[in-house]
């Protein structure tokens, strides 16, 4: 991972210690950068990214999108890092997605300037969208209810029209317009505002991403896309044009490419991957590689059959089971600790390092300040997670 104008190097990280972006408690081992074996001398628990696996994942997704003739707009809610976003953009991504306005602000502040906010914008946040646009950031938003349209129009009144997509409920029932006629009415309302520009639709099925059986997953996506197509036809029936049809995810990436309904794909987890995807996709996880780990240290080894490590409930998101520790197993052992069984082929001892696979990558990343980037056994860079905690 090499530095670019929009990417802070480890020197920048160290200079920023004590700032809002990087906290003094990070414990960055600056003197270890580039040294043989430095991967195993990072203060733990720490978030570690395998540079080669990350690069392979980014390349595979971009090649897949290019072969399908669709745009790739990766979701930065996974990595929350301008450095990783820059790698994705350099590989050919058309822009990046963010979940919240706060994430857009953080990444825009680090030089990422083409953003789609994929969660409906609450009226009290539209002024912050206006501020981003005033700063020259190309930001688009989604809407799923007519009541928010006047606020969006008001925020856009001082500049070029704000791009808006209609968010369609394709079966998740979390956000989105449920009925085709309502999607058409909302699109017409958006298009009628001089300060807004209707650009298309978004349809995301998060509930499909971890369906284990490939055939069942494909059938579920196809059914959801039929709902999206119904909305598209209803909107086009009003005379409006659909420029962007955005959605998709990591678990459905291949199906999304094959179906051809979406012309802009939003996978996020593919960059890092996690144990939840490994368990759900099993052999169907290709071409993605595990790139994200939480490195932990054995801090107690006084009992037969297991050791205690310094990564517990605070080190991982806990919504998706236990971290992966193959060939050992991991169990929660408190806020600060985890229990790891002794592996069958060797004995873990006090001070040994382990790299554990997070159960769920997105919220695990949100618990850390920096990514420790490694290649083989060398720590090659440390970059900030600018959008950590930006949940508004």
Model-derived regions: residue spans:
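Active-site loop/helix belt of alpha/beta enzymes
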Residues: 163, 169-282
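Active-site-proximal beta-alpha core segment in soluble small-molecule metabolic enzymes
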Residues: 74-209
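C-terminal accessory subdomain/extension
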Residues: 2-3, 302-392
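Conserved, mostly hydrophobic/aromatic
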Residues: 54, 77, 107, 166, ...
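Active-site loop ensemble at the mouth of alpha/beta enzyme cores that anchors a bound cofactor
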Residues: 217-219, 251-326
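Glycine-rich tight-turn/loop motif centered on a GG-T
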Residues: 39-51, 113-115, 130-141, 212-222, ...
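A charged N-terminal "starter" segment
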Residues: 1-131, 388-392
């Amino acid at each position: 991972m090499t530095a670019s104008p929009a990417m802070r190097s480890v020197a920048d990280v160290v200079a920023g210690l004590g700032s809002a972006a990087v906290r003094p408690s990070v414990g960055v081992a600056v003197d270890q950068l580039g040294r043989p074996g430095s991967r195993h001398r990072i203060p733990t628990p720490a978030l570690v990214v395998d540079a080669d696996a990350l690069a392979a994942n980014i390349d595979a997704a971009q090649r897949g999108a290019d072969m399908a003739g669709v745009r790739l707009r990766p979701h930065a809610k996974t990595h929350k890092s301008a450095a990783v976003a820059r790698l994705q953009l350099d590989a050919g991504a058309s822009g990046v997605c963010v979940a919240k306005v706060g994430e857009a602000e953080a990444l825009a502040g680090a030089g990422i300037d083409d953003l789609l906010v994929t969660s409906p914008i609450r009226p009290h946040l539209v002024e912050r969208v206006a501020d981003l646009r005033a700063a020259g950031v190309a930001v688009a938003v989604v809407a799923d209810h007519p009541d928010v349209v006047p606020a969006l129009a008001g925020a856009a009144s001082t500049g070029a029209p704000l791009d808006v997509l209609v968010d369609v409920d394709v079966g998740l029932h979390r956000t989105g317009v449920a009925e085709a006629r309502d999607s058409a009415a909302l699109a017409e309302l958006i298009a009628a505002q001089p300060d807004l520009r209707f650009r298309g639709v978004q349809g995301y099925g998060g509930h499909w991403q971890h369906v284990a059986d490939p055939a069942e997953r494909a059938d579920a996506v196809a059914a959801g896309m039929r709902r999206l197509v119904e909305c598209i036809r209803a909107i086009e029936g009003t005379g409006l044009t659909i420029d962007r049809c955005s959605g998709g995810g990591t678990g459905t990436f291949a199906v999304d490419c094959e179906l051809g309904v979406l012309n802009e794909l939003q996978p996020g987890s593919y960059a890092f991957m996690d144990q939840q995807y490994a368990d759900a996709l099993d052999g169907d996880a290709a071409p993605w590689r595990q790139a994200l780990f939480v490195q932990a240290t054995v801090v107690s080894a006084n009992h037969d059959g297991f050791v205690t490590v310094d990564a517990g409930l605070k080190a991982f998101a806990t919504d998706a089971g236990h971290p992966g520790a193959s060939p050992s197993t991991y169990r929660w052992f408190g806020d600060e600790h985890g229990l790891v069984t002794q592996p069958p082929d060797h004995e873990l001892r006090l001070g040994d390092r382990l790299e554990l696979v997070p159960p769920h990558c997105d919220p695990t990343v949100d618990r850390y300040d920096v990514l420790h980037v490694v290649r083989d056994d060398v720590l090659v860079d440390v970059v900030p997670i600018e959008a950590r905690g930006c949940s508004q």
